[in-house]
Amino acid sequence: MEEILIVTTNEVAGYRITEVYGEVFGLTTRSRNLFSSAGQQMKTVVGGEINGYTKLQHETRETSIDRMREEAKAKGANAIVAMRFDSSTFQNIDSVAAYGTAVKIEKI
């Protein structure tokens, strides 16, 4: 199985874009554990990293990237350029979208 190269730039050094398949997305929405949230709220008073939320955000981003990658593969792409994240939080729900442009590249 061919791997999908994902970059945040509009071009890939040493490659040229031969085909553009269009925008691809990966969306993940997760709710926070209410019991964990109560404990984490105490940390906001004294400061410091909130490890539970950091882990949740990391896992949510990785899942979004995986879904975007699968959509690009389904279109026949071997790369995604101009990859970005968008995220939002509402009450105890975190949502992350990974998006970019699916392309076919070849070495110059």
UniProtKB/Swiss-Prot annotation:
<protein>
    <recommendedName>
        <fullName>UPF0145 protein YjfJ</fullName>
    </recommendedName>
</protein>
<comment type="similarity">
    <text>Belongs to the UPF0145 family.</text>
</comment>
<dbReference type="Pfam" id="PF01906">
    <property type="entry name" value="YbjQ_1"/>
</dbReference>
<dbReference type="InterPro" id="IPR002765">
    <property type="entry name" value="UPF0145_YbjQ-like"/>
</dbReference>
<dbReference type="InterPro" id="IPR035439">
    <property type="entry name" value="UPF0145_dom_sf"/>
</dbReference>
